[in-house]
Amino acid sequence: MKTSEITEIEETTVTKKQVNPYIQAMVILLPSILALVASSATNVCQPNIAGYFGATQYEANSVITSYIIANGIMLPTTGYLAKLFGKKQFFLYCIIVFCIGAGLCLLAKDLHMLIMARIFQGIGGGCILPLCQAMLLDIFPNKKGFAMALYGVAAMFAPLAGPFFGGYLTDNWSWQWVFIVNIPLCLISIALIKFLIPKDEPVKEKYNKKFDIIGFAGIAVAMGCMQIVLDKGEQFNWFDTPWICWVTGISIFSFIFFYVWELEYKYPIIDIRVFKDKNFLYGTSISSIINILLYSTLLLVPLFSQSLIGYSPSASGLLMLPRAMVCLFGLLIMGEIAKLVENRLLTAIGFIIMAAACFMLSCLNTTASMHSIIIPNLILCFGVSVAFVPISALSFLTLPANKTADAAGLHALFKNIVTAISTSAASTFIARGGQVYQNNLVEHLAWHNPMYRVHLNALQHKFMMMYPSVVAQKKAAGTLYKQLILQSKLGAFYDAFLWLALMAIVVIPFLLLLKNKTKRIKAN
């Protein structure tokens, strides 16, 4: 076989069809949004699922984590399987498996069956998002900024809108409707993709020889163990529990083994060598910081509003809805703005906006109004939109076309790992940070502190108007202790938001490591 013929085999050939590329993009985005909503919508209906099956909250949490684990395990296989079957055909297979998984969730008679169904659904949903990214880059090869803006609609909007739609369906009908709506929409997606997306030929000559079962087992064990540690760590007091230490060690060893194996194996399940592209390596790392800022605040803001201000879960969900709207609007306009402004400058502006928003969140207190919470959230999500499009375009700018599927899978996997660790770390930071503040403040609740005596006496006189003196004294002391707990939590949130703001500022100089070839390409 000639060298030119071998090169042609490496490239995926696409059959040309006269279909509007914007219509094709919308068709590809629909199942991607469904896969992401399936992950975040169940967060809201978790208590309903626990009550329906008579399970505890920790047991019902496995409904969420089982889907995430299956997603994480399948992500690295995207590039290999896309080349083996062809992107379009593999995309259809993923949607079919995802749809069947949703149907199995409806048929579940107990919690264990539901968890198995969610694993099946997660296997289908795991590769949908990176495939969407790779296919959008194929549809718009000369408009990578616009392609990444469309991809951002699914990647950013769906997780933010998912809790709202999940809560709406659960409150008005039942938790089963979170899965019911997936089925007709998946069937519509399958039909539209079948007829509107051009078929690409699989590269079977290279990729049907051997399936890298050892590499797949390595990443499966690594991702599974990591998610178990992140999910159960807080419940079992993290590394004070021996089995948590063992599972963490297995996860780290499996990641290292996977990396070394994929570099040496002749037919790797995922091409680790794409990280040799400096733009992809640095761009993926910086994109992960955006995910940390977005998803950490997505966890912290509802937690702040519920634990410190007393909002209900539904009210906290409504606080998050404007974030989704701003993200959607920002991503749509940034696709065009990215053509006019240098990508690194635009990304830096986005991080400055995010840092300002996190600083505003750190200034919130227990008397904060709804508007004072919503406005920093809107600013944060606008900053995410500003930075997401150019940094995503820069990440894939210097990669050859036949590497986009591998790169998209690795890009999604890396961000998935960082996001999982950061959200778990944020939750632990609030719990442990509150304890540190409480230990420091409790020293001041002593009789030798004159301010303590003044406040205690004032509260006692207030309660003595309603209760006997002994009861009034206990209620006064209890009220002061509750205020101490409240201030301890507030201090932890203050520190968390400040650290996020600092992270957004520190990452800006690293943008200089990225190469921007936009001007040179236009000149040529």
Residue positions per predicted region:
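Structural signature of transmembrane alpha-helices in multi-pass secondary transporters
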Residues: A35, I64-Y67, N71, F98, ...
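C-terminal membrane-cytosol helix-exit motif in multi-pass small-molecule transporters
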Residues: P184-P202, A220-K232, I250-E264, I508-K515
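Helix-loop-helix hairpins in multi-pass membrane proteins, especially solute transporters
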Residues: L75-I214
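Hydrophobic transmembrane architecture of multi-pass small-molecule transporters
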Residues: K2, K415-A504, F510-L513, K522-N524
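Small-residue (Gly/Pro/Ala) motifs that create kinks and tight helix-helix packing interfaces
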Residues: Q46, A158-T170, M334, S422-I430
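Small-residue-rich alpha-helical segments with characteristic i,i+4
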Residues: L160-A161, I373-N457
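Cytoplasmic loop-to-transmembrane helix junctions
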Residues: E59, K143-L150, A315, K403-L410, ...
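Transmembrane core module of solute transporters
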Residues: V19-G79, K83, M113-L114, S174, ...
